[in-house]
Amino acid sequence: MQFAFDNSFHADMQGFYAPAEAAKPSAPRLLAFNDALAERLGFDRRGVDADELARVFSGEELPEGAAPIALAYAGHQFGHFSPQLGDGRALLLGEIVAPDGARFDIQLKGSGPTAFSRGGDGKAAIGPVLREFLVSEAMAAMGVPTTRALAAVTTGERVERERAHPGAVLTRVASSHIRVGTFQFFAAHFGADHVVQLSDYSIARHFPDLADAANPHLALLDRVIGLQCALIARWLGVGFIHGVMNTDNVAISGETIDYGPCAFMDRFAANTVFSSIDATGRYAYGRQPQIMHWNMARFAEALLPAIHRVSPADVEAAKALVDAIPGRFRAAWHAQVREKLGLSTSAGDDAELIDRLFDELEKHSVDFTTFFRALAMLLRGEGAMMQALLPAPDAMAPWIADWWQRIEQDAANPLDLADAMDAVNPLYIPRNHRVEAALEAAEAGDPAPWLELLEVVRQPFAARAGRERFAEPAPADAAPYTTFCGT
């Protein structure tokens, strides 16, 4: 299989990575390949069979032009600074430039130990690999910025975690793997010269329009803050809980990265947590905006040497950007919710309507995803879906009446609004009980349920006959759902 590698990070950023080599798997076998993404990247699959794909995307066979490296980074993990983390179980094969000119990293995740493994085996189990493949594809289909999955390959080996699991390797595609933690590593260990170099590279790669700004490093901070505000608003809009929002899991590209213990909320509760390692609820659904703010403050701290070098006065400007984050996020969030509610204009009392909505959803323990589809059905004159969803006929009645009044202010066609709402409010998400059942089946050797679920979540908005069960939340008496990071 031919790759047109153009490895700018390897060539331009020496000292920011360590050479790496993939472990050779005993019997690689292709589980899934993302043909649509491969086409987007300009890969030519003609004449390439599943065995060759398995060899390449397990790390057994190095493609021509690859320059495998493991990237260095640090990070705040649950609020505590770890000065050296890095790619402990992943290697960057290289970069390709797609036909449209976009540049992407091609990374193998679970490919064996690196210089940053800190005693770990560098491997991945099949469950976390298939979870990231599935959820990242669902997020992409819902329009949420995200890394993507190109391939999943089993290795023929067992990986020891709490018990032995089949080993696997994920091929991840990202605009880059530059993280907030990347800046933190070089700010902590090497100082201003390296931070300036990393910032200059990041601007050239991701945001070339910032190069002519009065202070490009300050402009980078501003841009990344804007992307993160928009990203977290999108997460909240689909009920997504990342689970481990450490600074090493924040990509400056604004893409969702490192799915680990992620999950989706069923019944709305702002304090929802699924991750087994988040005992204090630091990364709960409703705390994600505050954590984003905290992470961006850490990014600003790491960038300060570069910002100060151009203009010492801009240090105060950086502080002002960080202080303004809550307002910027709230604007992004309100715009997101207005879209979900079918509101085509902005009105002064929208903030109160939105805040009351989430109070009501929590009070009545309403399924978050289904509610917005039921709301659209009201615009079509059909109330059965909403009646079945709410615990009592008059539950949320005052709020719904106020929403109707607000809809009428926009003077739009209700049927057109309903269609617009259905185009942004997913019907099918990776429901946790469905994900778990699919992963258990795949680990037992039956990938069919996982493949079916993948097909469903890749088309999240349009209702399809025979797929009704995928829109249903977990049974009310289901045990609490817990996720694990898989490392």
From Swiss-Prot:
Catalytic residues (UniProt): 248 (proton acceptor)
Domain of life: Bacteria
Family matches, as Pfam families: SelO (PF02696)
Positions contributing to Mg(2+) binding: 249, 258
Cofactor: Mg(2+); Mn(2+)
EC number: 2.7.7.-, 2.7.7.108
Catalytic activity from the UniProt record: L-seryl-[protein] + ATP = 3-O-(5'-adenylyl)-L-seryl-[protein] + diphosphate; L-threonyl-[protein] + ATP = 3-O-(5'-adenylyl)-L-threonyl-[protein] + diphosphate; L-tyrosyl-[protein] + ATP = O-(5'-adenylyl)-L-tyrosyl-[protein] + diphosphate; L-histidyl-[protein] + UTP = N(tele)-(5'-uridylyl)-L-histidyl-[protein] + diphosphate
Entry GO MF terms: AMPylase activity; ATP binding; magnesium ion binding
Keywords, sorted A to Z: ATP-binding, Magnesium, Manganese, Metal-binding, Nucleotide-binding, Nucleotidyltransferase, Transferase
Top-tier EC class: transferase
Binding annotation for ATP: 86, 88-89, 109, 121-122, 172, 179, 258
HAMAP family xrefs: YdiU_SelO (MF_00692)
Family statement drawn from the similarity comment of this UniProt entry: Belongs to the SELO family.
Function field: Nucleotidyltransferase involved in the post-translational modification of proteins. It can catalyze the addition of adenosine monophosphate (AMP) or uridine monophosphate (UMP) to a protein, resulting in modifications known as AMPylation and UMPylation.
Identification of the protein by name: Protein nucleotidyltransferase YdiU
Organism expressing this protein natively: Sphingopyxis alaskensis (strain DSM 13593 / LMG 18877 / RB2256)
